[in-house]
Swiss-Prot record:
GO cellular component, one term: cytoplasm
SMART domains: Arg_tRNA_synt_N, DALR_1
Molecular function GO terms recorded: arginine-tRNA ligase activity; ATP binding
Lineage: Bacteria, Pseudomonadati, Pseudomonadota, Gammaproteobacteria, Pseudomonadales
Protein name: Arginine--tRNA ligase
Amino acid sequence: MKDTIRQLIQQALTQLVNDGVLPEGLSPAIQVENARDKTHGDFASNIAMMLAKPAGMKPRDLAEKLINALPASADISKVEIAGPGFLNFFQNTDALANRLDAALADARLGVRKAGPSEKVVIDMSAPNLAKEMHVGHLRSTIIGDSVARVLEFLGDNVIRQNHVGDWGTQFGMLMAYLQENPITSDELSDLENFYRAAKKRFDESEEFATRARGLVVKLQAGDPECLALWTRFKDISLSHCQKTYELLNVKLTMADVMGESAYNDDLANVVADLKAKGLLVESQGAQCVFLEEFKNSEGEPLPVIVQKADGGYLYATTDLAAVRYRSNVLNADRALYFVDQRQALHFNQVFEVARRAGFVGHPMQMEHMGFGTMNGADGRPFKTRDGGTVKLIDLLTEAKERAYALVKEKNPSLTEAELRHIGEVVGIGAVKYADLSKHRTSDYSFNFELMLNFEGNTAPYLLYAYTRVAGVFRKLGKGFDEVEGNIVLQAAHEQDLAARLAQFGEILNNVADKGTPHVLCSYLYDLAGLFSSFYENCPILAAETLEQQQSRLRLAALTGRTLKQGLELLGLETLERM
């Protein structure tokens, strides 16, 4: 609808230029926002205030001329001037009802991407292997997953890449410890304790550390025995990751793994190409790129080190190789990096070096989608009581158990199987939604009590809201797609719900553009609240006429489908009963 209004305004501006009211050469960014007060319309634009000065007119006078120049539209019932010169647009309720009827008949709910379809790489999750995933991996994994789902729903070709840390000193450490302590595969499956023991030896024994580094050199040289051990450790670690992804209902598989080791063969070429471009400077034996845009507190350019004095490569080297691969091999239009916002400087530097070196041969937009920290109740990074890292699988298991106990208390008559299933859906959904509902760049405090509450902006509330809609149709013995008739908007609660339903596509395009799933969370929470008001004030099954009942059932059906689709795009399962 906003695009329709922008087009109408653009036609009016063209008319006013032709009439000599506005000077030629104007190309304003036409802004159309949702009106805050529905009594003053559904949408508002400040275009008259933006152009009043070049027009040499008062904003309200220009607004009046704009209204007179606006083409007639079946979508708009009237346009009014408000305040200093806002244009307030009232949408035609019949046209709105027709759009919703069309959305209900569409598998995609009438949602279309605002721009052309693109190929998008999503760099997400990326745990360091050789140990189990911890809570610090949650945000990259589920935010990246949600944005990937939205992009796919809008029609983009999404390539998920799990840039795991599968190379480096930690593997030499594990191999050295395994040589000292031969164990069975079953014992090795407890990778966390094995890693902890190896790290202790590495920190306490210089002889052990030297041996571990030597094994890394042998691994890098392709030693068959070291490669076999490395593969063994990597496979065990990835299997742990996959179990966590499946529990989280995240669309990541082994086929999506594109770890650091995948770029090993290109690292020397990256350095050579940077040198050929004249970008490298030797500093204390290391090969660096200095960028004037990035300086330290003394005003000196910061180095982007791509090769250490001992010949070793760094994260920047691998990331540059990945940029080149994603642009020139995958031919991606966008590459979205869901990595902690504390890495912003690193990625800004890498992206700039890649551009200068010509590594981005295919025009590719590189975006660091940074995120804040998940903290404990004390506002500090989430830790165990003894200060250790919390395994992600342990956190999710506790969430399931807490939700199970809560559901059992409320519904003791359910079978054990039903309780376990509902407990898992609610528990995992609660953890994910509590994270996704916060602005991506914000820190937040993890709180089981708040996220498992059935009131407020939580997963349990939204899951229950969906079951409430589903319950209406269960009583009828019908599905959402089995309601005849047409939507007719008369009551205010019907119109409010309808107006919000019509914004689903706009919301999803916003998420896709900015990588912000919290926008979708807020929308679904608002939609659930509007449905609750509609349900309480507009009888559905006890409607006065058949036509009214069918109309309200169709509104309910579209609400149910939108809630279900929205939750699915967040990576949350839904329940038909709770």
